[in-house]
Amino acid sequence: MNDFVGPIVTVLTAIIGVAILAVLVSRNSNTAGVIKAGSGGFSSMLGTALSPVTGGTGFAMTNNYSGF
């Protein structure tokens, strides 16, 4: 079974890699905006996860989507 699944996973991974590369180098992509939004979301999740240890509230107000 591994002889069958391995090549399929390799091909699918290559297709996904090419798609990601195409999006990153496209003129119409907003790569910087996507990276900024992703890092802001990660920062918020990390702050929430560490809040019991650090004594924080767990709600980071660093992004533009917080309506508080």
UniProtKB/Swiss-Prot annotation:
Highest taxon in the source lineage: Viruses
Listed InterPro entries: DNA_delivery_prot_P32/34
The entry's localization annotation reads: Virion membrane
Disulfide bond positions? none
**Is Lipid metabolism given among the entry's keywords?**
no
Q: Which GO terms describe its cellular component?
A: membrane; viral inner membrane; virion membrane
Classify the protein's membrane topology as the record does: Multi-pass membrane protein
Q: Which UniProt keywords apply?
A: Capsid inner membrane protein, Membrane, Transmembrane, Transmembrane helix, Virion
Q: Which residues cross the membrane?
A: 4-24, 41-61
Any idea what this protein is called? Protein P34
Give the source species. Answer: Enterobacteria phage PRD1
The taxonomic lineage of its organism, from the top, reads: Viruses, Varidnaviria, Bamfordvirae, Preplasmiviricota, Tectiliviricetes
